[in-house]
């Protein structure tokens, strides 16, 4: 009997790589999205398309969240992005999503929750750090005894390394969504190309490691 795993899946590069890694490892996968009124509705559409493509069950939790207003920076360089936490950062989002995923996992008998958080390169977000993950695991073990194991296979990978893994798994640059400020056109959503997410996405694909054989950093961190 295969292990049932919930994947926190936004439709972005990181979470989609997690989804495909879980499938590759033979997990019984459920893609879990969170509809919290995000301005980038395109990510929900992309996640659904990917689930249909890879024949994965998709579930979306709807929550009401009166989020703080944030300024989405644009046209920043890679170096600028890496210097400080972006004003686009939504405090507590990853913690909240992980709690919801763990609660969902406990309810359906899933023994794993996978998340695409990563701390290398330019994220800088406090809830993408190994220290956060370590403390969250301790907290959730108290809240849900014998609850799901939290798997974060990308925690020590750079963005280009994640893009390389995506390529290996059959994903190309336009298959996932990574934009905070999309344009809604008659032909669908179009990335702005200027926000931090777009800049990092482009950087990742343009700087994929050239080596054809590298030792994998994948783990169950």
Where in the sequence are the language-model features?
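ATP-dependent adenylation/nucleotidyltransferase module used to activate substrates
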Residues: 1-170, 216-218
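Local cysteine-cluster metal-coordination motifs and their immediate loop/turn environment
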Residues: 99, 175-182, 186-203
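Short cysteine/histidine-rich zinc-coordinating motifs and their immediately flanking basic loops
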Residues: 204-213
């Amino acid at each position: 009997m295969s292990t049932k795993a919930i994947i926190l899946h936004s439709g972005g590069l990181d979470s989609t790589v997690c989804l495909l890694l879980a499938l590759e490892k033979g997990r019984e996968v459920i893609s879990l999205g969170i509809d919290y009124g995000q301005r980038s509705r395109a990510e929900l559409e992309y996640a659904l398309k990917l689930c249909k493509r890879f024949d994965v069950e998709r579930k979306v939790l709807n929550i009401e969240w009166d989020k703080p207003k944030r300024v989405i920076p644009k046209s920043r360089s890679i170096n600028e992005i890496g210097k400080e936490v972006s004003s686009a950062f939504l405090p507590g989002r990853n913690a909240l999503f992980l709690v919801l995923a763990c609660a969902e996992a406990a309810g359906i008998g899933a023994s794993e929750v996978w998340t695409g958080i990563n701390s290398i390169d330019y994220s800088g977000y406090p809830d993408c750090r190994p220290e956060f993950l370590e403390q969250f695991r301790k907290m959730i073990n108290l809240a849900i005894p014998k609850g799901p194991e939290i798997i974060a296979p990308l925690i020590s990978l750079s963005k280009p390394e994640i893009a390389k893994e995506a390529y290996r798994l059959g994903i190309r640059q336009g298959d996932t969504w990574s934009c905070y400020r999309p344009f809604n056109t008659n032909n669908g959503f179009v990335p702005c190309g200027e926000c931090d997410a777009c800049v990092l996405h482009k950087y990742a694909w343009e700087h994929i490691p050239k080596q054809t054989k590298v030792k994998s950093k994948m783990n169950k961190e």
